[in-house]
Amino acid sequence: STTMNEKLMENFLSLCAIPHKSHHEEKISRFLYDWAVKKGLAAVRDEEGNVIIDKPGSAGHEDAPRTILQAHMDMVVVWEDGMDFDPLNDTITVINDGKTLKAKGTSLGGDDGAGVALAMSILEDESAVHGPIRAIFTVDEEDGMSGADHLDPKHLDAKYLINLDWEEFGSLCNSSAGSDMYRMHRAAEWEAASGKAYKIAVSGLVGGHSGASIHLKLA
């Protein structure tokens, strides 16, 4: 029989075969919706492209608290200089050496393809004993969070939520980092240059990732 690891790999490779750059998740969004329908699972695809999939609890656990598994379907796409690659149409070529996965000349998309594939594998596992499960796959996590921003709060009706986008294998992070983005406009008119120009620089500060280094209280 197919093991969970084999099913996980199969699902991940199926995602790699679909271009899913941020802001261009139409194909993978439809794929996930169709996949759920074929599995006999209740699925919703909202106007933003988010996909919400529900699986009832296993026998005897239908009334247990619901657990949400959340992952994002977009990826950051980069490729080697000089490589002929179209991120909107070309697929990721995965290299598996038996120990690790990497992509040929491009980013792999493990963030967060691994999370999406894991949720898919859990949803189709008929041997597991579980309460109701809801998978929420959002778009545009890497560049704006528009998927999460436009998600109808009614889909968050659950006692537990597990985000499948953590950085360390075999560990859990009981926390969350957030961010705000603003776009400001001001009308301006050009003036003839005059006077002296000065350059002011603020440097030598120590920064860090807003999520991974937030506890260090850096500048």
Language model segments and positions:
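Active-site metal-coordination/substrate-binding segment of hydrolases
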Residues: 61-137, 141-143, 148-159
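Midchain, well-structured core segments that form catalytic/ion-binding scaffolds
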Residues: 84, 90-106, 141-144, 148-219
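Catalytic cores of large soluble enzymes that bind and process phosphate-bearing ligands
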Residues: 4, 20-24, 28, 107-111, ...
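Acidic/His- and Gly-rich active-site-bordering loop/insert found
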Residues: 4-99
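Alpha-helical scaffold segments in soluble metabolic enzymes
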Residues: 11-14, 31-34, 118-121, 150, ...
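Generic secondary-structure signature for well-ordered alpha-helical cores
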Residues: 5, 13-21, 37-41, 124-131, ...
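Beta-strand secondary-structure signal
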Residues: 52, 68-70, 134, 183-185, ...
